[in-house]
Amino acid sequence: MPPGGSGQGGCPRRPPALAGPLPPPPPPPPLPLLLGLLLLLGAAEGARVSSSLSTTHHVHHFHSKHGTVPIAINRMPFLTRSGHAGTTYIFGKGGALITYTWPPNDRPSTRMDRLAVGFSTHQRSAVLVRVDSASGLGDYLQLHIDQGTVGVIFNVGTDDITIDEPNAIVSDGKYHVVRFTRSGGNATLQVDSWPVNERYPAGNFDNERLAIARQRIPYRLGRVVDEWLLDKGRQLTIFNSQAAIKIGGRDQGRPFQGQVSGLYYNGLKVLALAAESDPNVRTEGHLRLVGEGPSVLLSAETTATTLLADMATTIMETTTTMATTTTRRGRSPTMRDSTTQNTDDLLVASAECPSDDEDLEECEPSTGGELILPIITEDSLDPPPVATRSPFVPPPPTFYPFLTGVGATQDTLPPPAARRPSSGGPCQAERDDSDCEEPVEASGFASGEVFDSSLPPTDDEDFYTTFPLVTDRTTLLSPRKPAPRPNLRTDGATGAPGVLLAPSAPAPNLPAGKMNHRDPLQPLLENPPLGPGVPTAFEPRRPPPLRPGVTSVPGFPRLPTANPTGPGERGPPGAVEVIRESSSTTGMVVGIVAAAALCILILLYAMYKYRNRDEGSYQVDQSRNYISNSAQSNGAVVKEKAPAAPKTPSKAKKNKDKEYYV
């Protein structure tokens, strides 16, 4: 068979094998190298879209079939993306208005404000947001568009302060994000990724020097100096009694046309509240709700789900973490700000008039409101370090938890005017519990005096005879739905001593500094022994047949307790006030009496010594007269020696002897 032919079925002959092994195929690139390349690409993409505000990249992961790949995500792409950012409303050509109104008792007065909003429009002049104070005060804040640029104007009592961004044109129909912050008279404004504009009024530079100089100004001249500084134009800092937020500018004659998304003001999501038909929000005009999406402001501890531009089938969870609210300028509030207002920003959570601002002369406080209690702890099973043991006296037929502070005496009970008879009251056994809950409140800010709208005026001297001088005011709130608690232990407050622990049941809002005693107050303590380290234990027992007892200390006489309901009759259960024992009152009285007695003794002793000193002087004068009379027994001698009369007796005797011998 010739070479190269087919043999055995025509199979072609295999070429002869070459000497030596074949080279191996090239190895695939290592997996760490691929991961490193993807990481660099992701970091470059994140750096490309970063802005001046974003100084930190947060590494996040997305999962795929090839493993976990870290990607650097920046928070700015979400703010500059043209999609929906929070609840979005479209304002039509006819104009529209969304108004959020604070209740009269919950109007805040703030020293710092934060505003953030996203919008798109083709208008060159319009009003987006305006915040007004109560009528008569004149404080306001307004975000507007003027000549296609964004500006803010506000007034907190002195002059109008303006800040704008002339370089950013926002009337191009694109989506823009505006952030505004105010601290006193200072303000910052940022549009999209443009640098932050800062505004510092000239009047604020003197505040530090004023604070230093005020320490040397006499107290009686403080008000005069303040009035003089006010006349000189010192910048005020508090936005007083904010009443309403208005979005749309229809009431200002410059209506906005376009879309507004995810508006935040001091933690309030006004557009979200409008979409939820909140009773405090009113809408009018040509307004249409678009929907909700990712939030405008990526805040702390929030997770946003978004679609990557280069991976349409991959969902990545992103979490953006921010630093504290005071280290960066011009950034938006966090989620904690949207739920709980910071205590340094919120000065007064009511319609009361702040005392550190001068433009509140026409402000009239109203009743009711919310009182912020800085030291309130919930029920706990741990015993307090120092407490008193007192029996629990519940009203039949249910048991109420009774919480005490640190000590109580009979002189700390409320006056008779603070309690009312149970007959005809709203809190009967057959009435609903909701009609009976009017809790007494505690305040860590006040001077320790209890106020009641039903009591006589505080300038009455007789009114204060039943109140001790105490430092802290403590109260007890009655629960809305009482549950049997036969054995209850409470944890001591972590703040100032004497602050009472309040149950976790919500209480009605009352204004700061106001007390509301509408339930009759009954003492529920009976002879507890005092001693450190003794935990508070409560045991259920039936009320005594006679009048309720009061706490007494060994060595002190028992004083009658004011009981308007009469002996053997108890008022309805309600708020009970317990104030810590103040032994300094008794010591002060004893000290005053002792000091008065000592002063009287010193005065009597001084009078006695002065009287004795006068009698001695009189005797000395008599002795001198006696010597002079003895010298006058010889008339001739007196005539001859008249100038020698005031001389000493020895000299006179010597002259007499000499004359005798002559």
Curated annotation (Swiss-Prot):
One Pfam family of this chain: Laminin_G_2
Domain Laminin G-like: 87-295
Glycosylation site residues: 186, 350
Alphabetical GO biological process terms: adult behavior; cell adhesion; chemical synaptic transmission; gephyrin clustering involved in postsynaptic density assembly; neuroligin clustering involved in postsynaptic membrane assembly; neurotransmitter secretion; postsynaptic density protein 95 clustering; postsynaptic membrane assembly
Primary residence: membrane
Tissues expressing the protein: Brain (neuronal synapse).
Keywords: Calcium, Cell adhesion, Cell membrane, Cell projection, Glycoprotein, Heparan sulfate, Membrane, Metal-binding, Proteoglycan, Repeat, Signal, Synapse, Transmembrane, Transmembrane helix
Signal peptide positions (record): 1-46
SMART domains for this protein: 4.1m, LamG
Binding locations of Ca(2+): 139, 156, 238, 240
Domain of life: Eukaryota
Chain residue ranges for the region called Disordered: 1-27, 408-458, 476-496, 530-557, 629-662
Location of this chain's protein in the cell: Presynaptic cell membrane
TM ranges: 587-607
UniProt membrane topology term: Single-pass type I membrane protein
Cytoplasmic side: 608-662
PROSITE patterns: LAM_G_DOMAIN (PS50025)
InterPro entries per UniProt: ConA-like_dom_sf (IPR013320), Laminin_G (IPR001791), Neurexin-like (IPR003585), Neurexin-related_CASP (IPR050372)
Biased composition (Gly residues): 1-10
Extracellular face of the membrane: 47-586
Membership in a protein family: Belongs to the neurexin family.
Biological role: Neuronal cell surface protein that may be involved in cell recognition and cell adhesion.
Record protein name field: Neurexin-2-beta
Upper classification of the organism: Eukaryota, Metazoa, Chordata, Craniata, Vertebrata
